[in-house]
């Protein structure tokens, strides 16, 4: 599917990036998320493919952080449609336990997100980023989502 030099990874600001740069930004934002527990921080990486000299975003990896916890989301173009996959933590206490539950949370996008959608495993997150730099590999998140989606479905 991918030929040499027909894709690259970029940040939202259109700046091409490397794994090392993304890893450094992740570490910096992770530390900040521990210091300011009511502000979420994030990192988004896009896989830009070049087809007939026209660049387009085919996959995105979004990482939100709050209080040292990570929320992972993948947007993936499959068959002309975008599919979204979230990491689901099968070891979370109860799917309906919400975290964070700060009434004055700065980022309302994370207010009342179920605890089962967060992980504290920074090494796993680093591996997900590293895989993404390998031609947009998002299998860890997709496989996790497919395997554990029942956890969220049973509480709908």
Question: What do the predicted segments below correspond to?
Answer:
Residues 1-123, 127, 131, 135, ...:
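Acidic (Asp/Glu-rich) sequence patches and key acidic residues
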């Amino acid at each position: 599917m991918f030929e040499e030099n027909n894709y690259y990874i970029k940040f939202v600001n259109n700046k091409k990036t490397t794994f090392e740069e993304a890893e450094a930004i992740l570490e910096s934002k992770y530390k900040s998320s521990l210091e300011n527990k009511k502000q979420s921080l994030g990192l988004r990486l896009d896989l830009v493919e070049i087809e007939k000299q026209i660049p387009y975003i085919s996959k995105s990896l979004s990482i939100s952080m709050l209080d040292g916890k990570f929320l992972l989301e993948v947007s993936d173009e499959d068959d002309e449609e975008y599919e979204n996959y979230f990491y689901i933590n099968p070891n979370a206490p109860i799917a309906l336990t919400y975290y964070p539950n700060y009434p004055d949370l700065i980022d309302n996008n994370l207010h009342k997100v179920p605890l089962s959608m967060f992980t504290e495993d920074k090494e796993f997150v680093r591996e997900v980023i590293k895989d993404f730099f390998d031609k947009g590999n998002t299998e860890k998140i997709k496989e996790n989502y497919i395997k554990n989606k029942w956890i969220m479905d049973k509480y709908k």
